[in-house]
Regions:
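Generic C-terminus detector
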Residues: 104-140
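C-terminal substrate-binding/catalytic lobe of Rossmann-fold NAD(P)-dependent oxidoreductases
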Residues: 1-106
């Protein structure tokens, strides 16, 4: 989290997020349990709506590997699950669920990503597409 200022990455002050990644005995997929606090209180409905309507730069630029939508939220108490949800948007999307209030932080939730399609290979391809689209990698 943060922004670039005078060539230096300046960490963001908010939201405060704590996360723990859980590797389970499946071929692909990582679950992350996350806790978040916000400067301005947010309702569960507001958070889910922000997730559902979020568009990052890859979506706005309509990059070939960019998932549309980037995030999906599950209302079910047992989702996301690695075997069921890791391939969302060809493995490039992120699945979220189990959003609940928390006594220490404001909220907690579970996130799921495909560790090879989104993480390693697909993530590298998406970054290359972004760098090309922004002119950092010139066309030959």
């Amino acid at each position: 989290w943060g922004h670039l200022e005078n060539g230096v990455i300046v960490p963001a002050k908010a939201p405060i997020i704590s996360a723990h990644c859980v590797r389970v005995a499946v071929a692909d997929g990582h679950l992350a349990t996350c806790w978040a606090s916000f400067e301005k209180p947010a309702t569960k409905e507001e958070i889910i709506e922000r997730w559902r309507t979020f568009e990052g730069l890859p979506q706005k630029m309509n990059l070939p590997s960019a998932p549309h939508p980037f995030l999906q939220y599950f209302e079910e108490d047992n989702r996301p699950q690695t075997r069921l949800d890791r391939d969302f948007e060809r493995g490039m999307g992120i699945s979220l669920g189990r959003l609940r209030g928390d006594s220490l932080f404001d909220w907690r939730f579970v996130g799921l990503s495909h560790n090879t399609l989104r993480g390693a290979a697909g993530g590298a391809v998406l970054i290359a597409e972004l760098l090309c689209a922004q002119g950092y990698i010139p066309k030959k």
